Design a protein with these regions (language model features):
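Conserved N-terminal glycine-rich FAD pyrophosphate-binding loop of Rossmann-like flavoproteins
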Residues: 1-28, 219
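Fold-independent oxyanion-binding glycine-rich loops
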Residues: 7, 14, 133-135, 152-153, ...
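FAD cofactor-binding and catalytic pocket of flavoenzymes
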Residues: 34, 221-246
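Hydrophobic alpha-helical scaffolding
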Residues: 35, 62, 105-110, 185-192, ...
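Glycine-rich loop(s) and the adjacent beta-strand/alpha-helix scaffold that form part
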Residues: 156-229
Length: 246
């Protein structure tokens, strides 16, 4: 997925710095005592989201994102997924104190790669299993219910299936279809594997489209920048390849 291509920063609502202490990988960092983390309330989080909604009210999913954000980050922390304050780009020094701004306070060490590694360790420690070279080619759909997946031609039954297969940013045709003709030329800064396969499989059995298919997060890029890549760069140099998502 795109996790490795991100900055590993986590946006979540919190009332004060005390709520952050249990989330930190290094709570004894000497800078902590001279740090003002401020607050990032649910109301502020909602306001920031509305600024990206182009006049639309908050969706049900956005409201859940806000209301469950602290609870979710605490759950990750309970499974040893830890974070560090983003001193380098989300704080400034004033009168001897590190003052945080913008609501983006914590990130994983080593950015998205570090976040991926921590989450993978947590998944495996909970008994999760990963099957490599096992592409899902179709959903098993019987009597109005998804009952598993086909891995190549092999049938794998399951009580439930989560299509955590990303969006369609790496699919030129779907970008053109949903976002516009010019988007066929867009540079893809994230993974080459998010080609919309999971979405297509779900739609083929009658799933209802949900969300803003004609919107995306994008940023100006060099015309000659290569598609994908960037994981071989140091985190501080990787910003040019942080993900573009749909």
């Amino acid at each position: 997925g795109n996790t490795k291509y991100t900055a590993g920063a986590m946006r979540f609502a919190y009332e004060n710095g005390d709520q952050l202490m249990s989330l930190l990988d290094k709570p004894n960092d000497k800078r902590i005592k001279d740090t003002d983390f401020g607050s990032y309330t649910q109301e502020k989080f909602e306001t920031d989201l509305l600024n990206f909604n182009d006049g639309r009210p908050l969706s049900h999913e956005q409201k859940i994102l806000v209301s469950k954000s602290l609870e979710t980050i605490q759950w990750l922390s309970s499974h040893n997924v830890k974070f560090e304050p983003i001193y380098s780009r989300q704080s400034f020094l004033k009168d001897g104190k590190h003052i945080f701004w913008g609501g983006l306070t914590l990130a994983s060490e080593n950015e998205g790669v570090g976040l991926f590694d921590q989450e993978l360790d947590a998944f495996l420690s909970l008994g999760g299993k990963i099957f490599y070279d096992s592409p899902v080619t179709n959903l098993i759909y019987e009597v109005g219910k998804v009952k598993g997946v086909y891995v190549n031609e092999e049938k794998v039954n399951a009580d439930s299936v989560i299509c955590a297969s990303g969006g369609f940013e790496a699919n030129d045709g779907l970008r053109k279809s949903y976002i516009g003709d010019n988007w066929i030329n867009a540079k893809v800064r994230g993974t080459p594997h998010n080609t919309g396969d999971g979405l297509k499989m779900a739609l083929e059995i009658g799933a209802v489209k949900h969300g803003l298919y004609n919107g995306c997060h994008a940023t100006p890029m060099d015309l000659h920048m290569k598609n994908y890549g960037g994981l071989d760069l140091e985190p501080s140099e990787r910003k040019n390849y942080r993900k573009i998502c749909y």
